[in-house]
Every structure is written in C-alpha cells, then in structure tokens.
Design a protein with these regions (language model features):
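Basic side chains
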Residues: 5-6, 26, 99
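Sec/Tat signal peptide C-region and signal peptidase I cleavage site
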Residues: 21-29
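N-terminal secretory signal peptides and thylakoid transit peptides that target proteins
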Residues: 1-15
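Mature extracytoplasmic or organellar-lumen-exposed domains after removal of signal/transit peptides
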Residues: 30-187
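Hydrophobic h-region of N-terminal signal peptides that target proteins for export
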Residues: 17-19
C-alpha cells in the first residue's frame, strides 16, 4: 500500500513520532574544569585590604598587553584571538580580572599618602575605555565580512576592524603606562 499524504496525516501521532536519540552534550566552553579553576585562582589576592597584593595581577596584565602588541601579526588572525588576550574570551588572560584588580587597589586600606587616588581612578577609567574599544573592534571583526560594510585601503572589512583594534590596543598600552607610573608609590 502506498502511503499518501492523507494517510500520514490521519495516522495516530504515536506512529509519527521520531525515535528519541540522546546525543552527548557539547561542552559550553573550550576549557576543562581544571583549567577554568586554575585560571580563576591565578592572581587571587590573599588580603584584599593590602594594595601591594594587586601588583602581580597588574604587572601580568601589562605584560599581556605588551605580548599582544609585539606579536600582533601572529595573534590577530581573527577577533577572538585578540579578545582572548584582552580577557574577554576565556579566563586564561590576567586581563580577565583587571577590573577587579583596579577596583581593589582603590579600595585597599593601606594606600600610602603619596598615592594619588583620584588620578589613578581617572587613569583606570581611561584604560578600561581603551580596552573596551579594542574588544569591541575585535568582536566586530568576527562579523564584518558578513555585513554590508566595506573595508578601507584595499583590506577586507574584518582586517579593517582588526586594524582599528590594533590602534585601540596601542592606546590601551599608553593608558596602562600611566597607570604603572601612578602605581610607583606602592612599590
């Protein structure tokens, strides 16, 4: 007997149900639990009231920015690679915790009188804005080739966005140098 559309529509729902197949769930992250836990515990601050406790995180963040800038052509093959260094994709970059580190310095109970809290707060805000600009341009590079945007200088739209991100990273490095200068009384 040939099955017609009418026969199929008239059939009980039980016979139409597709077999249930349980597939293994895909991991939500690129990192296993041990890697995530190790990254979260990296640069943990033993005593949040001590301003010097944040210096290792801040120093490592500066080195990460320097590494990104020095190896840009190798790293910036796509926006997510840049964002991985900026701490917005994954948890392995020290910049992943930079907001908390900067805020922690400002909240520390043992800041020396020579430390300019207002200047540090303003420099922190400028740095975080530059970092956010770099992250936004790197994120946009992921999708720029699929949009109606046009690249400049004979480059693809994503290459243009990565070029903007590179300038943002350089601005962030300049802002960060100012932060490090302001941290001198803590050393």
């Amino acid at each position: 007997m040939k099955a017609t559309r009418r026969c199929i529509l008239a059939a009980p729902a039980v016979t139409l149900a597709a077999p249930v197949v349980t597939l293994p769930r895909r991991a939500n992250a690129l990192y296993d639990t041990a890697t995530v836990n190790a990254a979260k515990n990296t640069y943990d601050v033993a005593d949040a009231t001590k301003c010097k406790a944040y210096l290792p995180l801040l120093d490592a963040s500066g080195k990460t920015l320097d590494e990104l800038a020095a190896n840009w052509d190798r790293i910036a093959t796509d926006g997510d690679n840049v964002r991985r260094y900026l701490g917005t994709v994954g948890v392995t970059s020290p910049l992943f915790k930079i907001r908390g580190g900067l805020k922690g310095v400002l909240k520390a109970k043992d800041l020396p009188d020579a430390f300019d809290v207002v200047a540090f707060a303003e420099a922190s805000e400028a740095f975080l804005n530059d970092l956010q600009d770099a992250e936004g341009d790197a994120y946009g590079a992921q999708f720029a080739d699929y949009s109606t945007s046009v690249g400049s200088g004979g480059q693809s739209p994503s290459a243009t966005m990565l070029g903007k991100a590179r300038k943002d990273v350089e601005r962030a490095r300049t802002s960060y140098a100012e932060l490090l200068r302001l941290l001198a009384p803590l050393r």
